[in-house]
Amino acid sequence: MMDFWTAFQAIILGVVEGLTEFLPISSTGHQIIVADLIGFGGERAMAFNIIIQLAAILAVVWEFRSKIFEVVFGLTNQPKARRFTGNLLLAFMPAVVLGVLFADLIHEYLFNPVTVAAALVVGGVIMLWAERREHRVEVDHVDDMRWSHALKIGFIQCLAMIPGTSRSGSTIIGGLLFGLSRKAATEFSFFLAMPTMVGAAVYSGYKYRDLFQPGDLPVFALGFVTSFIFAMIAVRALLKFIANHSYAAFAWYRIVFGLFILATWQFGWVDWSTAHG
């Protein structure tokens, strides 16, 4: 039976994951801070994180289900659908190759507060620069992307293996720098998240399969539902926001949050020694 405090922890972390996973502000840093504040850690937390990340990506699948069906059923007779699928697979492959080769090394040597904070601040500065530079739009819709756009964004996504970089942040900034409109860059980031995050969740789920215990099912289910709902809210809100605003607000938030993380480490406010990513 799940007690009130455990239910509260599951809901809070589900909300944090759902709201931050697809915003360019690094869900990793937020999860570590909040989990430490509410005392949710250990092996159970590692398994729980896999579940709520899977819920977040399924929210995106649901939100873009019409486009997904259009592409799937158009593969046999629509060049546009085949080109989009090819671009998605091309952008996905660099993360697969580099992830398999370097994921464990990165988690061992780079998962620390200094790296997370530096990645947040540097990413924020680059985001400000990308927004303020003259932006020549070559692609206004994801269906019009060329393979070269997809491949470059795929390599940029690999930077998100560095904790604090933010997967969505790196792909969105990359899209803007390579000539995509804000809408196209954001939507392609969402679509690219589907195979990337599902693949990562399956890999992590298999690697840490011994951590999943039947008694944790109620906690996992509550976190899953919460993460799903708030991820959907975040995705819809972001798409509406970028229609009339730049990413500057997120950039400044990253910089401030990065400095805050440095403070939590410097003054011992958060126990970073138990962080697993």
Curated annotation (Swiss-Prot):
GO biological-process terms attached to the record: cell wall organization; peptidoglycan biosynthetic process; regulation of cell shape; response to antibiotic
Keyword match Transmembrane: yes
Principal subcellular localisation of the protein: membrane
Bilayer disposition of the protein: Multi-pass membrane protein
Record keywords, A-Z: Antibiotic resistance, Cell inner membrane, Cell membrane, Cell shape, Cell wall biogenesis/degradation, Hydrolase, Membrane, Peptidoglycan synthesis, Transmembrane, Transmembrane helix
InterPro entries (UniProt xref): UppP
Top EC class of this enzyme: hydrolase
Enzyme Commission designation: 3.6.1.27
Family from the record: Belongs to the UppP family.
NCBIfam families documented for this protein: PRK00281.1-2, PRK00281.1-4, undec_PP_bacA
Protein name: Undecaprenyl-diphosphatase
